[in-house]
Amino acid sequence: MKIGKKCLFSSDVIIRTSDAHSILNGEGKRINKGCNVTIGDHTWICNGARVMKGTTIGSNCVIGSNTMIAGINTGDNVLVVVNPARVVKTDINWSNIRIIE
């Protein structure tokens, strides 16, 4: 697992690099091997999000609340939400400083 600099993780986030159990084929060989997870710099993983094996999240991204993201590469500067996870906005930025207008 690789996590970039200045990331923000809300509560109840789960990051998994494996299924935590084995699934075997008819010959007794494991078919669900673990895979790396990579999270870029300045990425915000919101409350209840699940980041599963084989996922690469780019830099400056937001993964929405309760989103399950599995085995995809998001690219940079995107908002990813819903299940199954999909990019819904591109060319985004975020700040942990509250802006009052």
Short names for language-model regions:
Residues 96-101:
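Charged, low-complexity C-terminal accessory regions
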Residues 1-56, 67, 72-74, 83-84, ...:
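Flexible, glycine/small-residue-enriched loop-and-beta-strand segment within the central core
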